[in-house]
């Protein structure tokens, strides 16, 4: 089982924590990570694209000229696709791009993402994370104490409002609860800062 240092908010080592091998110690599956990221990004698409077809554009109800005798090509409507201002053929329509991978694959993906952070030594485990009041300066100080100077994902056991409000104005820092942890967030941030209670909660669900 991988062991990592346990820190307090002042950046001091206060012990060690043993992480569950089944969650934080597996060989990361790159293909599953890829599939999970594609799924998440697809779900983020708005899908509100739309063009009008020949039935929806304005006008074109009358035949522009008679069928025969003019010497010109036959036409049925000035809103046919070949006309300027005509309707689009097989154009985009509003749709949802979201889909779901099997539950086992999704779980393997999040375990692979967490294990990759342990392998790269990009995980910081805190004994606890609490603030008396929302204060961005205090959160910056805590991150500096932990030598976290890059994009960081902070994971708490439950969404702490003071922690959330203190971190939301710091560029590159995001706060999520343990039950909201996902592959895209873990991979998109350089450092994973997670509380001991959140580790236990994640292991309880994924182990």
Swiss-Prot record:
<dbReference type="GO" id="GO:0005840">
    <property type="term" value="C:ribosome"/>
</dbReference>
<keyword id="KW-0694">RNA-binding</keyword>
<comment type="function">
    <text>One of the primary rRNA binding proteins, this protein initially binds near the 5'-end of the 23S rRNA. It is important during the early stages of 50S assembly. It makes multiple contacts with different domains of the 23S rRNA in the assembled 50S subunit and ribosome.</text>
</comment>
<dbReference type="GO" id="GO:1990904">
    <property type="term" value="C:ribonucleoprotein complex"/>
</dbReference>
<keyword id="KW-0687">Ribonucleoprotein</keyword>
<feature type="region of interest" description="Disordered">
    <location>
        <begin position="44"/>
        <end position="78"/>
    </location>
</feature>
<dbReference type="InterPro" id="IPR023574">
    <property type="entry name" value="Ribosomal_uL4_dom_sf"/>
</dbReference>
<comment type="function">
    <text>Forms part of the polypeptide exit tunnel.</text>
</comment>
<comment type="similarity">
    <text>Belongs to the universal ribosomal protein uL4 family.</text>
</comment>
<protein>
    <recommendedName>
        <fullName>Large ribosomal subunit protein uL4</fullName>
    </recommendedName>
</protein>
<dbReference type="GO" id="GO:0003735">
    <property type="term" value="F:structural constituent of ribosome"/>
</dbReference>
<dbReference type="InterPro" id="IPR013005">
    <property type="entry name" value="Ribosomal_uL4-like"/>
</dbReference>
<dbReference type="Pfam" id="PF00573">
    <property type="entry name" value="Ribosomal_L4"/>
</dbReference>
<dbReference type="InterPro" id="IPR002136">
    <property type="entry name" value="Ribosomal_uL4"/>
</dbReference>
<keyword id="KW-0699">rRNA-binding</keyword>
<keyword id="KW-0689">Ribosomal protein</keyword>
<comment type="subunit">
    <text>Part of the 50S ribosomal subunit.</text>
</comment>
<dbReference type="GO" id="GO:0019843">
    <property type="term" value="F:rRNA binding"/>
</dbReference>
<dbReference type="GO" id="GO:0006412">
    <property type="term" value="P:translation"/>
</dbReference>
């Amino acid at each position: 089982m991988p062991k990592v240092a346990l820190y307090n908010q002042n950046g001091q080592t206060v012990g060690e924590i043993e992480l569950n091998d089944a969650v934080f110690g597996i060989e990361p599956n790159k293909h599953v990570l890829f599939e999970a990221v594609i799924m998440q990004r697809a779900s983020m698409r708005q899908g509100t694209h739309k063009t009008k077809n020949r039935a929806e554009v304005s006008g074109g109800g009358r035949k522009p000229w008679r069928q025969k005798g003019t010497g010109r090509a036959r036409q049925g409507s000035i809103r046919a696709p070949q006309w300027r201002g005509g309707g689009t053929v097989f154009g985009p329509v509003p749709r949802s791009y979201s889909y779901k991978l099997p539950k086992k694959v999704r779980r393997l993906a999040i375990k692979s993402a967490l294990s990759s952070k342990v392998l790269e030594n990009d995980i910081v485990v805190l004994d606890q994370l609490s603030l008396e009041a929302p204060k961005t300066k205090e959160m910056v100080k805590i991150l500096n104490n932990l030598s976290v100077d890059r994009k960081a994902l902070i994971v708490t056991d439950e969404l702490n409002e003071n922690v959330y409000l203190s971190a939301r104005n710091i560029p590159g820092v995001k706060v999520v609860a343990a039950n909201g942890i996902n592959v895209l967030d873990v991979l998109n941030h350089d450092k994973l800062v997670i509380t001991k209670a959140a580790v236990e909660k994640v292991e309880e669900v994924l182990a």
